[in-house]
Amino acid sequence: MTSRKPLGRYRRIVIKIGSALLVDRKAGLKKAWLDAMCADIAGLKARGIDVLVVSSGAIALGRSVLDLPSGALKLEESQAAAAVGQIALARAWSESLSRDEIVAGQILLTLGDTEERRRYLNARATINQLLKIGAVPIINENDTVATSEIRYGDNDRLAARVATMTGADLLILLSDIDGLYTAPPHLDPNATFLETISEITPEIEAMAGGAASELSRGGMRTKIDAGKIATTSGCAMIIASGKTESPLSAIENGARSSWFAPSGTPVTARKTWIAGQLQPAGELHVDEGAVTALGAGKSLLPAGLRSVSGLFSRGDTVAIIGPAGREIARGLVSYDAEDARRIAGRKSAEIEAILGYAGRAAMVHRDDMVMTAQIRPKSERQKKDASYA
């Protein structure tokens, strides 16, 4: 069972706030709600807890300021709304936090800032320096320059990447959803609320719902994706409603929320970065023998490789997919896609004869790999796989 610790037991908390909580479509910024949230944050900081905020709302706030019509926005309209909204959003956070003599620092990230190793380290250093001097980083995706091809797509996953980047031990996702149900409760009156989730299994993933509101891009699907990123890196996660004022106090006082347990296996900073990669360059599909070997902490050898998909270069991050079609690990691949296909299913001793050079024995070395799913015994895996056939 997942341990529900008081928030004061955590040392570094990332809080993601959805657009609909901060911005009213007609009235604009919900200042009273923001002031109450900042008072909650001040309470955590008074207990010595580092707090980071991933704040949605720039596009929604800019849309309100510009009085744009309802409905989907074109890319250039969204970017214009973000340009206006980012200024207003940063000002609002700064003013509300200053009531408790807390300084806010704005950070706008693009996908490359967490997916490219050098930029990742630089962004992490900047955030850590802000925390060191007692400021609260207010983080958002830089929607003025991001396009569909180079964006996170939602702030749930961005928040998870920030949590893993900064070594946070708790991620709180606040939105208009109070947690995870076995089915959408507005569609199924028999839907059961899940208070604790010890592992994100295929069954849990199947419970994730779909689309979001006009003011936001997130949904339960993105929250489960965020949970996989965070918990794999040893960070617990909470999904809770932010509709009430002082939602952090409400969580501490027992308000309904879903708690996700972190992985029991600590990972290095480098493996944390690998695990959280949002866009693997390709996929390596492996057999049952390889799954068993990886579960035992061994490297992935070419012999266990059934097929290769995608275009990638040596050193890129790839997803490792088991026979049931589920991702089980991620790692830095030792070969480019073309050579990986040529040696798939072959013994390591044959590599030089096939490729004409002596490459690494492992397709993905265990030091460059992190498990993203728990590997059960083979008999149990086969039984579960049959239920999805």
UniProtKB/Swiss-Prot annotation:
Residues 281-358 form the PUA domain. It is an enzyme of class 2 (transferase). Substrate binds at residues 56, 143, 155. It catalyses: L-glutamate + ATP = L-glutamyl 5-phosphate + ADP. Pfam families: AA_kinase, PUA. CDD domains: AAK_G5K_ProB, PUA_G5K. Its EC number is 2.7.2.11. One of its GO terms (biological process) is L-proline biosynthetic process. Keywords: Amino-acid biosynthesis, ATP-binding, Cytoplasm, Kinase, Nucleotide-binding, Proline biosynthesis, Transferase. ATP binds at residues 16, 175-176. One of its GO terms (molecular function) is RNA binding. GO terms for cellular component: cytosol. The keyword Phosphoprotein does not apply. It is found in: Cytoplasm. SMART domains: PUA. Catalyzes the transfer of a phosphate group to glutamate to form L-glutamate 5-phosphate. PANTHER family: GLUTAMATE 5-KINASE, ISOPENTENYL PHOSPHATE KINASE. Belongs to the glutamate 5-kinase family. NCBIfam families: proB. This is Glutamate 5-kinase. It comes from Rhizobium etli (strain ATCC 51251 / DSM 11541 / JCM 21823 / NBRC 15573 / CFN 42). The lineage of its organism: Bacteria, Pseudomonadati, Pseudomonadota, Alphaproteobacteria, Hyphomicrobiales. The gene is proB.
